[in-house]
Amino acid sequence: MILAIDTSSKSASCALLDGDDVIAESFCNAGVTHSATLMPMVEGLFTATGRKTDEIDMFAATSGPGSFTGVRIGASILLGLAFGKGLPCVGVSALEATALPFESFRDVIICPVMDARRGQFYNALFRNGERLTDDRAISGEDLYAGLSTGNSPVLLCGDGHALAAPFMKDLVLVDAPRDLIYPRASNVGRLARRIREASPSGTFTDLEFKPVYLRPSQAERVMSEKKQ
């Protein structure tokens, strides 16, 4: 059984999966801090299903990019739950997890966007289930410039979709179902399973799980400016 969590954006979610099948999932987009909501949500999954924590054989979480605080909270909770158990801990790209529900869309550019502040988005591009770019921090203008060189329609998803839409100008946009716009822990679990199966010799220990930050945090920027 997989326990998967996502805290990379404004929403938070957790899920229990048996393979790719969802046993139970909890999702919250109420604007409450993840540190206050996630553990009660996880506990609620076990209460509702009657499953036990010793049934877990893999942990999965979004390792970034996204909210610095959110990613750190998710990593801390994952590592706390996994401590001493010797079970695989698999980190998943939040952008890839957001794009996953749309991998069956043919010849459409799947464009997950997360608000990175400071005039940028966290973004990656996918088409026909294949990754086209690495995860990156990019301006709306540069994102449009790259997309406008092709003729494929574009599907925006992620918590930055409404902010990114005005930059898309004359591009053909495909509407995404609103309940699929945000990353879901169930898709984090599915991706983690694929990653582990693709690397059967990988250990994926809790010590190897590392958050991915594409930019320095605000605190790190302030510290760097003071040193200059």
Give the residues covered by each predicted segment.
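N-terminal beta-alpha supersecondary unit
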Residues: M1-P65, Y182
